[in-house]
Amino acid sequence: IFQMDMKGGQAESIYRAFGKVPVLTSPNMLLPFWFLEGLAVYYETRLTQAGRGRSSIYDMYLRTAALQDEFYTIDEISSQYLMESWPGLQAAYIYGVSLVTYIAGIYGEEALWGLSRAFSETPLLGFGGVLEDCLGVTLGQLWGDWQAWLKEKMLSQGEAIVRQGLVDGEQITRRGFRV
């Protein structure tokens, strides 16, 4: 909620003149879905003893994507449309927290707020433009760097799991993930 209500530049001027007009005075609600939800899950994890960022299930989804080299695209996790394959809309949360954690780890946690602040001041640049201005990388570069980092991390995790011994599961339905 905090990052969505940031305002600067023209949005702040409009707010002072007309009050809260959601899209005009809260431009961060237009941030990519993965960044909005990734930031929320990142802080949910960082500021509590729980948090989905520590979830072994999230790790499993990302490990599977990394080891099979079958990632969702950045477009798919940036919007809120219904995705027909598992894990559906949860992909924005799962990928988002991993991407946000990567950004904080590589560029520093202050970069997260810098991106939110910069987007609130210049939303017409789009997230890609703000990313380039703030971090000096394109969205495509960030996406590729994150995938390489994740593959390396998950390969190591996968090898450790294999050493412990795999457990075979049993498929109980063919109806898909909406059962």
Name each model feature, range by range:
Residues V162-V179:
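Beta-strand-rich domains and repeat architectures in extracellular enzymes and scaffolds
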Residues M4-W113, R117-R163:
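Acidic/His/Gly-enriched intrinsically disordered linker/tail segments
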